[in-house]
Amino acid sequence: MRTLAVYIGMTFLPRFVMLSRSRKFGRYREARRANWAFGTIQSSIALLVLLSLVHSSRAVAANPDLETMLTRSRQRIEKLDYRMTGRLTRVEGDGKRTSYKFVAKAHWFSDGLRLLCEISGPGSEKTSLLLRMSVTGQVAIETAHPGEKTASVLPFERWNNPLVGTDFSYEDMVEDQFFWKNQELLAPEKYGARDCFVLKSRPGSQDRTHYDSVTSWIDRGILFPVHVVKTLRGTEPQKEFIYYGLRQVGGVWSATQVEAKLQGKSGSSILVIEAGSGKANLGRKDFDISQFNTQEEKGK
């Protein structure tokens, strides 16, 4: 506030001096008008900035629940340090199941999150996926698909492609929506028996995503999402995520099962966590996707 007040004062002061001199020297009338117009524009801009900051501070003050939710959600992600194994299963409308072994590890470093997933198909083929998310929520994805000896950057236009034929996409593997610029607290709702905050997250111009918005139903007691709806850009259908088996280990809440459903499409996909550790003490060397692929080649 002080900086803006000083800026406004410095904007008006030269205008006052010039106007006083213009009265004494009439031949500078045109210069006086130009300076007055320029000064008016500057002061108007400064006033608009001031009003916008006041409005923003009032909005934050009026939504302490919003600030608490965002802080807790981000802190939960910033404390990640786990290894886990489980199954990723696509369930067709007729009940037919296709299951994949799912192995993942994640750790938050000083420059952000790293998540490495290894998905084994019904045969011996494996897909590797390395996601990086910066401290501001910017995402980068590398993949190594069956038959590829080296990993490569996944083009943005493929981020929302199905992951090994399931309803999960590549970008669904991280919760970057909590780091997006635009966050709105909607009216509270019940989801089943749970009282929930409802948070609507929208990406800013700098956020790379195929989603137009993500709406999260967050349990008021544990501040963990129990239901999420992602709206794709354009005319694409919505995608729904349901979290089951919520548990607290070492003070950290997590889900043991996540189900993904695509609106208008029969069946669903289920990610089940079967075992793991929430304190894996991982380092950067544990997220070398090229090293993983080299080890796989040696093991054949």
Where are the model-predicted features located?
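N-terminal secretory signal peptides that target proteins for export/translocation
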Residues: 1-37
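Bacterial N-terminal signal peptides
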Residues: 42-54
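Boundary at the C-terminal end of the N-terminal hydrophobic targeting segment
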Residues: 59-62
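N-terminal mature ectodomain segment of secretory-pathway/periplasmic proteins
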Residues: 64-147, 184
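Short amphipathic beta-strand and strand-loop transition segments with alternating hydrophobic
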Residues: 105-107, 184-190, 244-246
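Gly/Pro-enriched, hydrophobic low-complexity segments
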Residues: 150-152, 161-163, 168-176, 190-290
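Surface-exposed beta-loop interaction hotspot
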Residues: 177-181
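Short, low-complexity, Pro/Ser/Thr/Gly-rich segments in the mature regions of secreted, periplasmic
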Residues: 287-299
